[in-house]
């Protein structure tokens, strides 16, 4: 999978997108075939997948966290399943946020593990089985929508209202991961995040396909005292400009911006540059939670940078506060039907309100 999205993916199709069309066609054939014909392992608990149609960030991790919090209020024990992208471990592992570092397990699993039981696995079926053994009664997959490795009971596809699906072309000519018709066929619900009209076309397509639609926004937690402060902001996420806009909405003036690749671990000279520029210009340093956890256990002056960083924590807030519970209930109901079809025996979870 492409890890860095070139800027032309997010603009109107140009000669590069059209020139790469033959390769996009081949990529789409393979990705679509995998989604349709992949052998999906089945586990005896409900599985919710939080995915997106495109390469890059759309808010999957904060969405997964919001669902886990809702699950816990219902008395469930959710468990996160992640591939551990950016980490070096290639064995199925229960993530310990106190002992593991991002270099081993990836940055997103560390954030997830602060909230609930988290397992990383190269084979998602292995990870799901481990979560069940560890006592999870609801699995929330952070990404993996196109992988076709695990039977999914509810696929919530997250789409950024300001970016949509970019130029609409498949990889490598655009950011789309598999043919949209195929992806929509496996979509249970769509979540539009933020304001903007870039996602309107795909929302209409989903509506015509009878898919339920939810909306949400990303809210910052605290940091109101940044109003009027001059800061150096750095981010190594899929869309750093989104983070910079968030900092500006808090009233801070960004004097210096530093953008890095998604999941990128900073080199010693990059850490030193951030600290030296902030010292020279008298700036506070702000960053994302993902960038912060990647610095833990780092070398050189990383501890100094950790001590000086102000982390902008965010949360996904659904417009309808009951939406997460509704999604969980639908996943539970779908899992019950799947278990009956497949002949599972034992305790069956029921949506809230049923006995």
From Swiss-Prot:
HAMAP family: LpxK. Pathway: Glycolipid biosynthesis; lipid IV(A) biosynthesis; lipid IV(A) from (3R)-3-hydroxytetradecanoyl-[acyl-carrier-protein] and UDP-N-acetyl-alpha-D-glucosamine: step 6/6. Belongs to the LpxK family. Transfers the gamma-phosphate of ATP to the 4'-position of a tetraacyldisaccharide 1-phosphate intermediate (termed DS-1-P) to form tetraacyldisaccharide 1,4'-bis-phosphate (lipid IVA). It comes from the Bacteria. Its EC number is 2.7.1.130. InterPro entries: LpxK, P-loop_NTPase. It catalyses: a lipid A disaccharide + ATP = a lipid IVA + ADP + H(+). It is an enzyme of class 2 (transferase). Keywords: ATP-binding, Kinase, Lipid A biosynthesis, Lipid biosynthesis, Lipid metabolism, Nucleotide-binding, Transferase. One of its GO terms (biological process) is lipopolysaccharide core region biosynthetic process. The keyword Lipid biosynthesis applies. GO terms for cellular component: plasma membrane. Pfam families: LpxK. This is Tetraacyldisaccharide 4'-kinase. GO terms for molecular function: ATP binding; tetraacyldisaccharide 4'-kinase activity. Signal peptide: none annotated. ATP binds at residues 54-61.
């Amino acid at each position: 999978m492409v890890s860095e999205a070139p800027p032309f993916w997010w603009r109107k199709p140009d000669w590069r997108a059209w020139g790469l069309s033959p390769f996009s066609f081949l990529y789409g054939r393979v990705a679509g075939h995998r989604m349709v014909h992949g052998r999906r392992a089945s586990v005896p608990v409900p599985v919710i997948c939080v995915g997106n149609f495109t390469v890059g960030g759309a808010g999957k991790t904060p969405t997964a966290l919001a669902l886990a919090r809702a699950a816990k209020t219902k008395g469930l024990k959710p468990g996160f399943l992640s591939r551990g992208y950016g980490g070096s471990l290639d064995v199925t592992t229960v993530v310990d946020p106190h002992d593991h570092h991002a270099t081993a397990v990836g940055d997103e699993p560390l954030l997830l593990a602060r909230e609930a039981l988290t397992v990383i696995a190269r084979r998602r079926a292995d990870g799901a089985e481990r979560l069940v053994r560890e006592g999870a009664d609801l699995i929330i997959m952070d990404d993996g929508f196109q992988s076709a490795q695990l039977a999914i009971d509810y696929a919530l596809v997250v789409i950024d209202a300001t970016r949509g699906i970019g130029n609409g072309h498949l990889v490598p000519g655009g950011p789309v991961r598999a043919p949209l018709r195929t992806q929509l066929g496996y979509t249970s619900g769509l979540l539009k995040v933020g304001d903007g009209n870039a996602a309107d076309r795909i929302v209409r397509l989903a509506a015509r396909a009878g898919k339920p639609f939810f909306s949400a926004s990303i809210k910052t937690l605290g940091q109101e005292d940044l109003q009027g402060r001059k800061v150096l902001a750095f981010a190594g996420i899929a869309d750093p400009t989104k983070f910079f806009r968030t900092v500006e909405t808090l009233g801070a003036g960004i004097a210096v911006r530093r953008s890095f690749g998604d999941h990128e671990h900073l080199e010693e000279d990059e850490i030193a540059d951030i600290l030296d520029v902030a010292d020279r210009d008298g700036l506070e340093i702000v960053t994302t939670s993902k960038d912060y956890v990647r610095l833990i256990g780092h070398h050189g002056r990383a501890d100094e940078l950790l001590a000086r960083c102000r982390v902008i924590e965010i949360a996904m807030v659904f417009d309808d506060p009951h939406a997460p519970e509704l999604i969980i209930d639908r996943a539970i109901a779908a899992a019950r039907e799947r278990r009956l079809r497949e002949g599972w025996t034992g305790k069956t979870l029921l949506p809230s309100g049923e006995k």
